[in-house]
């Protein structure tokens, strides 16, 4: 709670009556300009007292300051029975625990904030003693103000109305800050701060308070509404989630190839639909799956080969598509660079022409302060942009804006310093149409040159693209040729292996045949007759031998025939390989 006192002029007498004493603290340098005045309706707000209040060291002066008493309960205008304003008396500094009364008096020539009182002094319960005086302040009165803050507001408003109507004398008005009063009384207006405007400074010339400082029940209702709106504001602040937009596919992009099963499904779907027109997609897919499972590996390989061929074509098309995208990006970047270069050249020409004019003007001094107008016979030529152009006599013609207040004695030295013929007289201020046409023609020529350069760049880019396509095609052809050569080499290697295997088989057959011949020869050696013995038994036995051995030549003849046949069978087989 801040109670502000404003001292009067220096040299006031020490002995003052009550009105003068209160006027000393209630008046400022400019007179009665207090705000948020509190008064009583019956002019009995303050009561004189015999006790004196000793201020801190301001000399030997002593001032009588009466205590501030609450309004009587019998006031019919307030309409608030059993309610007392909890204002305490201003007493000497008390040595209480942590409750310090620290007055601060400014110099008499300045309006600075003065006395500051601790909050605990206002909220203390019990009896406050001050030089023999005491005032009872019960806990129930403070709790009533905390429970019903609107009554406090009504009392304050009523007191300000009474002060306006002139019931109280101006010497009995005291300034009290409204926000600090409500904070020290422990008011809780629905969890929100009471909106109030800053009071008028003490230097104002009117003694009546501002109407914005009065607070009533409607202000409290408005604060409650504002709190409700603030609570609902975060809910409404939530932004709805925007769905992500899908990127549109480029129609020129090649489509991915389909699998072998998808190709088989396309081929068989129409036939199944023709046989079963009422079949659903799920039933058709089941039938196709069963048919795919029942297919042989050779039939499946046919569809797989088709998919592989489609994949190769897709890779080729994708490479070409990406190359085209790269070329387009390069073309766009080249166009942007050309546009930037043109803009930079135009800006540089404008800067150079303006710099030439500025340097020439700075060399010949500043323009005098007194404005001088050109003769009426000299017309003004205004050009939007300064341009430099080459004339046959190597003269630089720049567009100059001649103002009405420019002195006429600048033209000759400016022309002599630049070494060029500039527009300064009747004949030179007006640009001839031939010069304008020449400028226009130069601009057209520049534009044509730029277009030609752009066309050349585009053609060069197209050639590069064509070369890139050719290189890609050559690479693909080389890869295809290499693949074909690898397949051919593999086939040749397989054939060579087969030949080697067949030769090994023939060699094995020959070895077997030789072994058979050796076995036959061995058998023949074993079958040959042993030497004859001179005995009757041998004669008897040998007699039938010729009969038995007679068929041996036939068997020997048969063996060469078998050998000749086997040789004739082996020779044609060897000739084949």
From Swiss-Prot:
Name of the encoding gene: Tox3
Source species taxonomy: Eukaryota, Metazoa, Chordata, Craniata, Vertebrata
Annotation: DNA-binding region: 254-322
UniProt keyword annotations, A-Z: Activator, Apoptosis, DNA-binding, Nucleus, Transcription, Transcription regulation
Location in or out of the cell: Nucleus
Biased composition (Polar residues): 529-543
Low complexity biased stretches: 203-214, 470-480, 518-528, 550-577
Bilayer-crossing regions: none
Comp. bias (Basic and acidic residues): 222-238
UniProt keyword DNA-binding, yes or no: yes
Signal peptide: none
Stretches for region Disordered: 188-258, 470-490, 518-577
Annotated InterPro entries: HMG_box_dom, HMG_box_dom_sf, TOX_HMG-box_domain
GO biological process entries: apoptotic process; calcium-mediated signaling; negative regulation of neuron apoptotic process; positive regulation of DNA-templated transcription; positive regulation of transcription by RNA polymerase II; regulation of apoptotic process; regulation of transcription by RNA polymerase II
Role description: Transcriptional coactivator of the p300/CBP-mediated transcription complex. Activates transactivation through cAMP response element (CRE) sites. Protects against cell death by inducing antiapoptotic and repressing pro-apoptotic transcripts. Stimulates transcription from the estrogen-responsive or BCL-2 promoters. Required for depolarization-induced transcription activation of the C-FOS promoter in neurons. Associates with chromatin to the estrogen-responsive C3 promoter region.
Protein name (Swiss-Prot/TrEMBL): TOX high mobility group box family member 3
Species for this entry: Rattus norvegicus
Tissue: Expressed in the cortex and cerebellum.
């Amino acid at each position: 709670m801040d109670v502000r006192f404003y001292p009067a002029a220096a040299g006031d007498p020490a002995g003052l009556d009550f009105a003068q004493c209160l006027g000393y603290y209630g008046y400022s340098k400019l007179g009665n300009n207090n705000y948020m005045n509190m008064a009583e309706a019956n002019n009995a707000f303050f009561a004189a007292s015999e006790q004196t209040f000793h201020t801190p060291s301001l000399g030997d002066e002593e001032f009588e300051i009466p205590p501030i008493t609450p309004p009587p309960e019998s006031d019919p205008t307030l309409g608030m029975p059993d309610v007392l304003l909890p204002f305490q008396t201003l007493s000497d500094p008390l040595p209480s625990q942590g409750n310090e009364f620290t007055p601060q008096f400014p110099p008499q020539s300045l309006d600075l904030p003065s006395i500051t009182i601790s909050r605990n002094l206002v909220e203390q319960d019990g009896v406050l003693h001050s030089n023999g005086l005491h005032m009872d302040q019960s806990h129930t009165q403070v709790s009533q103000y905390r429970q019903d803050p609107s009554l406090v507001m009504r009392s304050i408003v009523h007191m300000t109305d009474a002060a306006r109507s002139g019931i109280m004398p101006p010497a009995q008005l005291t300034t009290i800050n409204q926000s600090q009063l409500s904070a020290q009384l422990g008011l809780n207006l629905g969890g929100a701060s009471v909106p109030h405007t800053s009071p008028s400074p003490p230097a104002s010339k009117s003694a009546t308070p501002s109407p914005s400082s009065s607070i009533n029940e409607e202000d409290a209702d408005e604060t409650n509404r504002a709190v409700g709106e603030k609570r609902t504001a975060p809910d409404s602040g939530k932004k709805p989630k925007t769905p992500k937009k899908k990127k549109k596919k480029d129609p020129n992009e090649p489509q991915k190839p389909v699998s072998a099963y998808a190709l088989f499904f396309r081929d068989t779907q129409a036939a199944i639909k023709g046989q079963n027109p009422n079949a659903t997609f799920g039933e058709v897919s089941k039938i196709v799956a069963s048919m795919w499972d029942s297919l042989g590996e050779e039939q499946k390989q046919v569809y797989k080969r088709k998919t592989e061929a489609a994949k190769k074509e897709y890779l080729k098309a994708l490479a070409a598509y990406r190359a085209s995208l790269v070329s387009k990006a390069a073309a766009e970047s080249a166009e942007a660079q050309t546009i930037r270069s043109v803009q930079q050249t135009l800006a540089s020409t404008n800067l150079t022409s303006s710099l030439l004019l500025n340097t020439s003007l700075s060399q010949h001094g500043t323009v005098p302060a007194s404005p001088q107008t050109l003769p009426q016979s000299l017309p003004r030529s205004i050009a939007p942009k300064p341009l430099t152009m080459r004339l046959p006599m190597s003269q630089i013609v720049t567009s100059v804006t001649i103002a009405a207040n420019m002195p006429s004695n600048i033209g000759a030295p400016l022309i002599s310093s630049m070494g060029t013929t500039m527009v300064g007289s009747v004949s030179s201020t007006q640009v001839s149409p031939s010069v304008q046409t020449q400028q226009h023609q130069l601009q057209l020529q520049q534009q044509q040159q730029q277009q030609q350069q752009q066309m050349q760049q585009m053609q060069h880019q197209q050639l590069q693209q064509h070369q890139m396509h050719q290189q890609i095609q050559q690479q693909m052809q080389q890869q295809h040729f290499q693949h074909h050569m690898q397949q051919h080499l593999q086939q040749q290697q397989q054939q060579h292996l087969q030949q080697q295997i067949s030769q090994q088989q023939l060699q094995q057959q020959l070895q077997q045949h030789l072994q058979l011949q050796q076995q036959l020869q061995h058998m023949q050696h074993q079958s040959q007759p042993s030497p004859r013995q001179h005995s009757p038994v041998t004669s008897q036995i040998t007699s039938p031998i010729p009969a038995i051995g007679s068929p041996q030549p036939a068997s020997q003849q048969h063996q060469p025939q078998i050998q000749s046949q086997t040789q004739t069978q082996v020779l044609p087989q060897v000739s084949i390989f």
